[in-house]
Design a protein with these regions (language model features):
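Active-site-proximal, substrate-binding regions of enzyme catalytic domains
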Residues: 29-32, 49-77, 84-85
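Active-site neighborhoods of divalent-metal-dependent phosphate/nucleic-acid chemistry enzymes
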Residues: 2, 76-119
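Acidic, PIN/NYN-like endoribonuclease modules and their adjacent C-terminal/linker elements
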Residues: 1-6, 30, 75, 107-139
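Alpha-helix boundary recognition
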Residues: 33-36, 70-74, 90-91, 107, ...
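A generic structural signal for short hydrophobic patches within well-formed alpha-helices
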Residues: 14, 49, 86, 122, ...
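General small-molecule cofactor/ligand-binding pocket signal
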Residues: 43, 79, 130
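Short, well-structured N-terminal submotif of metal-dependent ribonuclease cores
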Residues: 1-44, 57-64, 124, 138-139
């Protein structure tokens, strides 16, 4: 039996689900459901969780942010973020440093793919970069 695919999920995919953003909600929710069901091994970059916490508590409350992140951690792994991650990201020729950190995090957790809606932000890509709908079509 082939091993299940490993993906690093960009924060915008989570926000599509949490904020029910159309027309992206359906495919992003299907991706998270596949991770929750164990069909895919999903990772988030560590810094995405701090940003997510901030955005949730700004609109709702700290308690709600804690509850949502606690739930996510039941089925999503956290990609390590250390000095090596930062140093490698600094050496990527990306306009946005946060995107470089995401890409290096994906490489370090041995992801098969980085799933995002902003494919153009991850060039040059060190591994495949796909939208949720496109990745789901590969399953």
């Amino acid at each position: 039996m082939a091993s299940k695919p490993v993906v690093l999920i960009d924060l915008n995919v989570l926000l599509d689900v949490l904020q029910k953003r159309e027309p992206f909600f359906k495919s992003s929710a299907e991706l998270l459901a596949a991770v929750e069901k164990g069909r895919i091994q999903g990772f988030l970059a560590a810094h995405s969780l701090t940003t997510l916490f901030y955005l949730i508590q700004k609109g709702k409350s700290s308690a709600e942010a804690r509850a949502i992140i606690t739930n996510l951690l039941q089925f999503i792994h956290v990609a390590l973020l250390d000095q090596n991650t930062i140093e490698q990201a600094l050496n990527l020729d990306y306009e946005d440093f946060e995107d470089a950190v995401q890409m290096i995090s994906a490489v370090q957790c041995k992801a098969d793919c980085l799933v995002t809606r902003n494919e153009k932000d991850f060039q040059p890509a060190l591994l495949p970069v796909m939208k949720p709908v496109d990745f789901l079509n590969t399953l």
